């Protein structure tokens, strides 16, 4: 990513009433959807400037540099805005191959079955106890 000369581009994003926009992180090489998170204006600006995904943690009420604890950073290759300008898509390279705090490649590891249950379909790549020491 490169350092934008101005921040006018941020004005084109349709922020919600809390100043947030939903963000989808998609692995560029495979097309896999890895996670969903939120960004505020500062997070999106810093993501564009640094080339690494920085989100807004609603639970911690602070910026969250993805991988700051685990080392599983997301290198941002492309930032896209949807047709309504209210969802951001990050095309990323997932360092370490793990995006989910459960130790899986993707946060979307549960599949709905016709009987109304959920099935875990993706394995744990690394035990979270070994990631977050």
UniProtKB/Swiss-Prot annotation:
InterPro entries: PRA-CH, PRib_AMP_CycHydrolase_dom, PRib_AMP_CycHydrolase_sf. Zn(2+) binds at residues 83, 100, 107. GO terms for cellular component: cytoplasm. Signal peptide: none annotated. It is an enzyme of class 3 (hydrolase). Its main location: cytoplasm. Binds 1 Mg(2+) ion per subunit. Binds 1 zinc ion per subunit. One of its GO terms (molecular function) is zinc ion binding. It is found in: Cytoplasm. Mg(2+) binds at residues 82, 84, 86. One of its GO terms (biological process) is L-histidine biosynthetic process. Its EC number is 3.5.4.19. It catalyses: 1-(5-phospho-beta-D-ribosyl)-5'-AMP + H2O = 1-(5-phospho-beta-D-ribosyl)-5-[(5-phospho-beta-D-ribosylamino)methylideneamino]imidazole-4-carboxamide. Pathway: Amino-acid biosynthesis; L-histidine biosynthesis; L-histidine from 5-phospho-alpha-D-ribose 1-diphosphate: step 3/9. Belongs to the PRA-CH family. Catalyzes the hydrolysis of the adenine ring of phosphoribosyl-AMP. Homodimer. This is Phosphoribosyl-AMP cyclohydrolase. It comes from Aromatoleum aromaticum (strain DSM 19018 / LMG 30748 / EbN1).
């Amino acid at each position: 990513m490169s350092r934008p000369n101005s921040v006018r581009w941020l004005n084109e994003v349709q922020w919600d009433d809390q100043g947030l926009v939903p963000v989808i992180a998609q692995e560029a090489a495979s097309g896999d959807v890895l996670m969903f998170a939120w960004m505020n204006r500062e997070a999106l600006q810093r993501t564009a400037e640094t080339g690494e995904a920085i989100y807004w943690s609603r639970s911690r009420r602070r910026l969250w540099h993805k991988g700051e604890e685990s080392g599983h950073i997301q290198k941002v290759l492309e930032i896209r805005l949807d047709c309504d300008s209210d969802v951001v898509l990050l095309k990323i390279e997932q360092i370490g191959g793990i995006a989910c705090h459960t130790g899986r490649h993707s946060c979307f590891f549960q599949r709905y079955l016709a009987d109304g249950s959920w099935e875990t379909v993706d394995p744990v790549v690394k035990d979270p106890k070994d990631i977050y020491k």
